[in-house]
């Protein structure tokens, strides 16, 4: 497939990389100011994809062949507070925005454990709100050439990166908004929900304590499934005993598609592997897919949140 590359200079590429963040457009800042959150919009909240070294092109080509979209020109840069080097690019697809990292050096701890990068309308306020919400700051705020970053951890060990840049990007709205997929134990669920909902300004959309275990490869069993909505996008929390078959729990994001069968066919033709499914549940079908470079994603059709 011919890749649609956006011809950006290195500074512009860095602006796009969610691991080092971007500033909010003025219209988005105005909107965010009206709510009790520092969110800007789901298209600025990017899934972090750390590929197997040398597999960045294969991953991006496969993703774009499956979902469509564009990508920025690759940049070789340091995106951590301690010395490191990664080749990085941003993928803008209709189903979600991804920051892709192909590290040339070992990845400094705890980078690689964060699931997403959240653009803050106000960085300092975002860090304060994270602390006030009960999250730990696991990477203290640090400057990069064009902005600021920090990594926070919510109860249950869920990491996310907060970022902000002085120069604002402008991305088109997504066709479908992806879900953050979180796996927790009963011991951590209450504390996580309290902290996460306070930080995101979110709400509980549904809380099914007897959800179909078939959704997680456990037919005949049940689990607790909590769907959350917020200005950052959707989140699906699966509360289980941790007895999960592979690859459940390895995915961090779920992507909504209009035709799951057709999408899986495209993915396989583009070099991806269907690891599980599709499974038809209550009003939705889902499958687990691994793309070149090792990235595992949940794909679903129908009601999710």
PLM regions: where:
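N-terminal low-complexity, Pro/Thr/Ser-rich intrinsically disordered segments
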Residues: 29-43
């Amino acid at each position: 497939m011919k890749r649609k590359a956006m011809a950006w200079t290195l500074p512009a590429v860095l602006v796009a990389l969610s691991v080092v963040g971007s500033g909010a457009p003025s219209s988005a800042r105005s909107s965010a100011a009206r709510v009790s959150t520092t969110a800007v919009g789901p298209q600025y909240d990017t899934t972090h994809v750390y590929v197997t070294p040398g597999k960045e092109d294969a991953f991006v080509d496969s993703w774009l062949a499956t979902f469509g979209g564009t990508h920025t020109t690759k940049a070789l840069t340091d995106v951590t507070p301690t010395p490191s080097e990664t080749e990085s690019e941003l993928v803008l697809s209709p189903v979600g925005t991804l920051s892709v990292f192909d590290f040339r050096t070992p990845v400094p701890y705890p980078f690689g454990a964060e699931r997403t990068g959240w653009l803050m309308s106000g960085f300092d306020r975002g860090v304060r709100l994270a602390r006030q919400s009960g999250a730990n700051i696991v990477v203290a705020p640090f400057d990069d050439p064009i902005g600021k970053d920090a990594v926070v951890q919510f109860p249950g060990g869920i990491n996310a990166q907060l970022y902000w840049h002085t120069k604002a990007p402008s991305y088109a709205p997504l066709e479908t908004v992806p879900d953050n997929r979180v796996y927790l134990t009963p011991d951590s669920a209450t504390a996580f929900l309290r902290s996460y909902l306070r930080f995101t300004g979110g709400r509980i959309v549904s809380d099914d304590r007897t959800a179909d275990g078939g959704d997680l490869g456990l037919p005949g069993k049940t689990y607790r499934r909590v769907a959350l909505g917020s200005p950052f996008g959707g989140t699906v929390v699966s509360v289980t005993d941790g007895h999960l078959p592979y690859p459940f729990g390895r995915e961090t994001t779920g992507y909504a598609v209009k035709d799951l069968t057709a999408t899986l066919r495209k993915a396989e033709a583009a070099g991806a592997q269907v690891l599980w499914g599709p499974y038809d549940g209550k009003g939705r079908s889902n499958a687990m897919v691994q793309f070149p470079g090792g990235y595992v994603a949940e794909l679903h059709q129908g009601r999710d949140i």
